[in-house]
Amino acid sequence: MTVISQPHEYNQHDLFIDLRPVIGHPLFLKVEGLNFAGSVKLKAASGMVAAAEREGRLRPGSVIVESSSGNLGVALSMIAASKGYGFLCVTDPRCNLQTRLLMEALGAEVHVVTEVADPARGLLGARMDYVRARCAADPRYVWLNQYENQDNWQAHYRQTAPAIDRQFPDLDVLFVGAGTTGTLMGCARWFHEHRPSVRIVAVDVVGSVSFGGPASTRMIPGLGMGVRPPLLNESYIDELVMVEEADTVRACHRLARRGFLFGGSTGTVVSGATSWLARNGRDDLTAVTIAPDLGERYLDTVYQPNWVQDIYGDDVLRSLDLDAGRLSEALPIPMPRVPMDAAVTSEVA
């Protein structure tokens, strides 16, 4: 029997779904949403809060503040409520109503940024500017800064990657979505040091500038960035797959038709992994990807036909009723080999 006294103490680490019957390729999906925060962001949130407490930055009366499109905000709302801190989440209109209501139910203040002062930095830049202004005006406010916080990727170095390795000692390729790149860099660094034969494939969404692509409008929160992630070190990554948001929606519905309701970020990584495996896979390949969240918070967007039609058009809406397998082929992009940083001595295999 498991007994806990605080909600962040529980997290299911070792549940995997065999997706071969769904996508027709060998792929195991690591489910990260089985905790009270509902997403993989619980790990980073717990790690960053614990570090801030050890450093004396968080103390009684502190107010945690963070820029988040949703999942990290929920995780921090839960932890702040449990530990007695205030919490301010700074988000933008892509954060869906259900997520905002969930944060508020946990006692958080939610501020939605709608105006962009610098088009080059977009809504994310506007969110961070607002965070800085609030912190400058009130010393109680403590910005954890998930975009630069080393405890973000270290949480996945300590937990996510070893959990995958324990279950798949013969792993060939790992697909990881790229947002702040905390999950990506934590897993990539761990496998580089301990299992360098594992191929690391990053999955990002078209419109994200993380890997140097042009910025464009993105409607699904989670993966992708409007500025280059400070945590990103491309030398740990072997390939990149870019996924259209329409294919994210198709992948989500494809999974839902088999009874698995996952969030938009999961649809993106499954779509990217499916296209890569269709081009490069073998029946004896061992491949794993990570499902960052579940689908309940996307019922009024990704799973809502009117929303899909308004955003992506009639063709995409009609494609959701077709037989599984209509994911378009996202192109794998080889990553350039660049020198490793001084803290790493071995080479990427």
Question: Where are the predicted features?
Answer:
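PLP-dependent amino-acid enzyme catalytic core
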Residues: 1-349
